[in-house]
C-alpha cells in the first residue's frame, strides 16, 4: 500500500481545509503554510490540495542526483482519485474528451527510484488540465532540465503549480475541474556556499518560444502567486537567492 499522511488540525477534517503542525516545515522545498492549506504528504512529494479547483495549489519536493536514476516505469500506471483525501476530487471521466491532458505537477519521471513513489504521482492531487503540446513540449523540457540540475548540483528543490488568473479556459467535467491559465515552477539549488534560484511561468498553450523568455526571479513569481517559496531558509539567505537569476548559471 502506498504511504500517505493527511494532516488535519486536531485530527478533524473540515470543509476544504486542513493544517498540521506535524509536517517538517524546515524542509527547504516547502512554501510557507497557511492555516487554510489542505496538506497531503506522499512518499516523494507534498501537495497543497484545493477542493474548489480540484487541483493542487502547489506541489513541492526535493530531487536528489540518485533519485534521477532507477528502474520504475510509468507503463500500466493511471490516474485515480486518492481515496484517503476526504474532499471532492477530479476523476478520469472529467478529462475524457475534454481536449486537455492529465498534467503531472510532480512528474512521474522524477520518481524512477521507487515504483511505489511513482504510483503516488498518479493521483489527481498531483494533476491539472494541461495543454497536450505544452505537456509534451516546453514543460517536459523544463522537467528534464530539473533532472539535469539535480545531477549537476546533487540536489534540487522544486515547487510547481497552476496559475488560475482570469480562468479564461473555464472548467472540465462534472467535477468542474478548473483549467489553469498558466503553470509555474520555482527551483533552488546550493552551489558551493551559495544558493541560486530561478523561476518560470508558462501559459497553458503550445509554445514555439525560448525557455529563457519564460524565466524570472523567484521574487517576481512570489509577487504573481502570493506564495512565500522556500520559507524555511533564513531570511537573509532567501532574500539574496531569490532576488535575481543568471541564465548563464542555469545554462539556458
Predicted regions and their residues:
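Domain-level detector for secreted/extracellular nuclease and nuclease-toxin modules, and
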Residues: 16-252
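Bacterial N-terminal signal peptides
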Residues: 7-15
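Positively charged n-region of N-terminal signal peptides that target proteins for export
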Residues: 1-4
Amino acid at each position: 500500500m502506498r504511504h500517505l499522511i493527511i494532516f488535519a488540525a486536531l485530527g478533524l477534517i473540515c470543509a476544504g481545509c486542513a493544517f498540521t503542525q506535524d509536517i517538517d516545515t524546515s524542509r527547504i522545498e516547502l512554501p510557507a503554510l497557511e492555516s487554510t492549506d489542505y496538506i497531503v504528504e506522499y512518499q516523494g512529494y507534498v501537495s497543497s490540495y484545493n477542493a474548489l479547483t480540484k487541483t493542487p495549489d502547489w506541489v513541492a519536493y526535493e530531487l536528489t542526483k540518485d533519485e534521477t536514476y532507477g528502474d520504475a516505469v510509468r507503463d500500466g500506471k493511471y490516474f485515480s482519485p486518492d481515496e484517503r483525501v476526504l474532499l471532492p476530487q477530479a476523476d478520469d471521466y472529467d478529462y475524457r474528451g475534454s481536449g486537455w491532458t492529465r498534467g503531472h505537477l510532480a512528474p512521474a519521471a522524477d520518481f524512477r527510484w521507487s515504483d511505489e513513489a511513482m504510483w503516488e504521482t498518479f493521483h489527481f492531487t498531483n494533476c491539472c488540465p494541461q495543454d497536450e503540446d505544452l505537456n509534451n513540449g516546453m514543460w517536459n523540457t523544463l522537467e528534464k532540465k530539473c533532472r539535469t540540475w539535480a545531477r549537476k548540483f546533487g540536489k534540487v528543490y522544486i515547487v510547481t503549480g497552476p496559475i488560475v488568473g482570469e480562468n479564461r479556459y473555464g472548467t472540465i467535467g462534472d467535477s468542474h475541474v478548473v483549467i489553469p491559465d498558466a503553470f509555474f515552477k520555482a527551483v533552488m539549488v546550493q552551489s558551493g556556499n551559495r544558493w541560486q534560484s530561478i523561476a518560470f511561468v508558462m501559459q497553458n498553450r503550445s509554445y514555439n518560444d525560448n525557455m529563457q523568455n519564460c524565466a524570472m526571479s523567484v521574487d517576481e513569481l512570489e509577487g504573481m502567486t502570493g506564495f512565500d517559496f522556500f520559507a524555511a531558509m533564513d531570511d537573509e539567505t532567501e532574500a539574496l537567492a531569490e532576488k535575481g537569476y543568471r541564465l548563464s548559471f542555469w545554462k539556458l
